[in-house]
């Protein structure tokens, strides 16, 4: 089996219940999310801007092709997971980018997840109405 010379950088991102596996390959700036263009995958442009933030911040949007496989969650959670995956892959390319990315708050994983519903309550914290008499 012959090993290829193509360099690729991988990053894993998680947000809420979404998991994104990101692969950066030196190229022309092509982006595919689950084998589709981001404009065809995500419902609005703000989500795409949120997803592309690490590449725009480091001025590497035209340097790498981005291939993403993302599962679970909604569109905002998926965009956040992709953003973290891209950030981690970029740090593998050049370690000096980490300080700029950290200042923008992109390196830290957002660990907030939906709180579970408890029995005896209507939701995670909403209790039945209290009656005094």
From Swiss-Prot:
GO molecular function annotation: RNA binding; structural constituent of ribosome
GO BP term (any one): translation
Gene Ontology cellular component list: cytosolic small ribosomal subunit
Keyword annotations: Ribonucleoprotein, Ribosomal protein
Classification via InterPro entries: Ribosomal_Su5_D2-typ_SF (IPR020568), Ribosomal_uS9 (IPR000754), Ribosomal_uS9_bac/plastid (IPR023035), Ribosomal_uS9_CS (IPR020574), Ribsml_uS5_D2-typ_fold_subgr (IPR014721)
Pfam families membership: Ribosomal_S9
Keyword Ribonucleoprotein: yes
HAMAP family: Ribosomal_uS9_B
Annotated family: Belongs to the universal ribosomal protein uS9 family.
Name recorded for this polypeptide: Small ribosomal subunit protein uS9
Species assigned in the record: Ureaplasma parvum serovar 3 (strain ATCC 700970)
């Amino acid at each position: 089996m012959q090993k290829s010379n193509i360099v690729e950088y991988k990053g894993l991102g998680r947000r809420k219940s979404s998991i994104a596996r990101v692969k950066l390959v030196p190229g022309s700036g092509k982006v595919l999310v689950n084998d589709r263009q981001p404009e065809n995958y995500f419902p609005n442009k703000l989500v795409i801007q949120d997803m592309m933030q690490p590449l725009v911040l480091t001025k590497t949007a035209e340097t790498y092709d981005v291939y993403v496989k993302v599962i679970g969650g909604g569109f905002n959670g998926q965009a956040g997971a992709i953003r973290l995956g891209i950030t981690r892959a970029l740090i593998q390319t050049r370690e000096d980018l980490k300080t700029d990315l950290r200042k923008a708050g992109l390196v830290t994983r957002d660990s907030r997840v939906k709180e579970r519903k408890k029995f005896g309550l209507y939701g995670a914290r909403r209790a039945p109405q209290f009656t005094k008499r």
